[in-house]
C-alpha cells in the first residue's frame, strides 16, 4: 500500500479552446506519444460536429456528461462468495472513465477515419444512444441490481 497519495497532474490548456479538459481527452486519445496527431483528430472531430450547425465543444461536453458513470460495482469476497458492491465514483475519476469509454467505443466503429468515428460516437452519446451510453447504462443497472449490498464498505 502506498504511503502518500500521488499528486494530481496539472494540465496545460489546449491551444485553441484554452480548456484543460480538452488536453486530458487528447492525452487519452494519443497513441505512441503522437500528441499533434491526437490534437488534429480532436479538432477535426469538433469541426465535423459543427457541420450540424451546433457548437461542437458544448456537444462534446454534454456527450461526456451523458456517458459519465456515477456508480460502479466492485467485487468483494465475503464468506467464500464474491459479491458485487456498488460504490460511488469520485468526480475526477468519473470524467476519466467517461473519456476512456467514449474513445474506446469510437475506436470500435466502422468509419474509415478516426475523427469521423469519434464525431459519430460523440453525436450518438449526445442523443443518449450508441455503444458508450449503453455501457454506462449497463454499469448503472448492475449497481441497481446489487443495491442490497451497498451497506458493505469496500
From Swiss-Prot:
Gene3D superfamilies given for it? Ribosomal protein S7 domain (1.10.455.10)
What Pfam families does the record point to? Ribosomal_S7
Which InterPro entries does the UniProt entry name for this protein?
Answer: Ribosomal_uS7 (IPR000235), Ribosomal_uS7_bac/org-type (IPR005717), Ribosomal_uS7_CS (IPR020606), Ribosomal_uS7_dom (IPR023798), Ribosomal_uS7_dom_sf (IPR036823)
The entry lists its GO molecular-function terms as: rRNA binding; structural constituent of ribosome; tRNA binding
What are its GO cellular component terms?
small ribosomal subunit
Question: Out of the domains of life, which is the source?
Answer: Bacteria
Q: Which GO terms describe its biological process?
A: translation
Ordered alphabetically, the record's keywords are: Ribonucleoprotein, Ribosomal protein, RNA-binding, rRNA-binding, tRNA-binding
* Entry function: One of the primary rRNA binding proteins, it binds directly to 16S rRNA where it nucleates assembly of the head domain of the 30S subunit. Is located at the subunit interface close to the decoding center, probably blocks exit of the E-site tRNA.
PANTHER family in alphabetical order: RIBOSOMAL PROTEIN S7 (PTHR11205)
| Family the UniProt entry places it in | Belongs to the universal ribosomal protein uS7 family.
Partners and quaternary state? Part of the 30S ribosomal subunit. Contacts proteins S9 and S11.
Q: What is the designated name of this protein?
A: Small ribosomal subunit protein uS7
State the organism named in the record.
Answer: Karelsulcia muelleri (strain GWSS)
Amino acid at each position: 500500500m502506498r504511503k502518500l497519495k500521488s499528486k494530481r497532474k496539472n494540465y496545460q490548456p489546449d491551444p485553441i479552446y484554452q480548456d484543460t479538459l480538452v488536453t486530458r481527452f487528447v492525452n487519452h486519445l494519443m497513441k505512441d506519444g503522437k500528441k499533434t496527431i491526437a490534437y488534429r483528430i480532436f479538432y477535426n472531430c469538433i469541426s465535423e460536429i459543427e457541420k450540424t450547425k451546433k457548437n461542437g465543444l458544448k456537444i462534446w461536453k454534454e456527450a461526456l456528461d451523458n456517458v459519465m458513470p456515477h456508480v460502479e460495482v466492485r467485487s468483494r469476497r465475503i464468506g467464500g462468495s464474491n459479491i458485487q458492491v456498488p460504490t460511488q465514483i469520485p468526480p475526477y475519476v468519473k470524467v476519466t472513465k467517461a473519456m476512456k469509454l467514449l474513445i474506446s467505443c469510437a475506436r470500435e466503429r466502422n468509419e474509415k477515419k478516426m475523427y469521423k468515428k469519434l464525431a459519430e460516437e460523440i453525436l450518438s452519446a449526445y442523443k443518449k444512444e450508441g455503444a458508450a451510453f449503453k455501457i454506462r447504462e449497463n454499469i448503472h443497472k448492475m449497481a441497481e441490481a446489487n443495491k442490497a449490498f451497498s451497506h458493505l464498505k469496500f
